[in-house]
């Protein structure tokens, strides 16, 4: 899968490989301190070896991870990364996603989430959930747009909220009344009356 990057280069989204260790380390180290804190829920310096192992050792079954790559020489090799880790029962998985500052707002996160949802659906996982710092308004907006709902303030003391959604496709609801009219006007497509 390729998509347009900010500098009009093609990005490729693929599963993480062990050979991505150096690129993932560079990606994490290039994040500003606030972005690292939002992604890892705490201050980290660089990319410690234990973290690097967790980022690269995805088995493709219980732990699935993707990277968005930019091959342009002046751009970072990894534009974003996303992953999920399934629970012991295999019916739900916690996910995480992070996009380099240079690629935010370019659709990279949307494509990474699409890949995660497709992989989870194929694995029979019913729910994805993510724990997000309450102050991370950008991520909260992204989660809403992706169909996630705030499940509960997970840890009010730490300021972490849990967002979740079903992995299945979003249901298409029948539009009625004003909502039906507005939907037709916005979509500019005729909607058959039922």
What are these regions (language model features)?
Residues 1-194:
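Long, contiguous binding/interaction regions
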């Amino acid at each position: 899968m390729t998509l347009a990057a900010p500098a009009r280069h093609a990005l490729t989204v693929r599963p993480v490989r062990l050979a991505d260790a150096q690129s993932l380390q560079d990606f994490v180290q290039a994040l500003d301190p606030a972005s690292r804190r939002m992604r890892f829920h705490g201050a980290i310096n660089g990319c410690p070896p234990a973290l690097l192992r967790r980022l690269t050792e995805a088995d493709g079954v219980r732990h699935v991870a993707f990277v968005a790559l930019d091959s342009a020489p002046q751009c970072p090799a990894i534009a974003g990364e996303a992953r999920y880790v399934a629970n012991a029962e295999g019916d739900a998985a916690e996910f995480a996603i992070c996009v380099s500052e240079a690629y935010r707002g370019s659709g990279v996160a949307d494509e990474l989430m699409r890949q995660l949802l497709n992989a989870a659906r194929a694995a029979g996982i019913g729910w994805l959930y993510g724990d997000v710092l309450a102050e991370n308004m950008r991520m909260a907006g992204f989660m809403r747009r992706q169909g996630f709902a705030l499940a509960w303030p997970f840890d009010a003391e730490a300021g972490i909220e849990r967002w979740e959604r079903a992995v299945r496709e979003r249901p298409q609801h029948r539009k009625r009344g004003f909502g039906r009219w507005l939907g037709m006007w916005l979509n500019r497509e005729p909607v058959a009356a039922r």
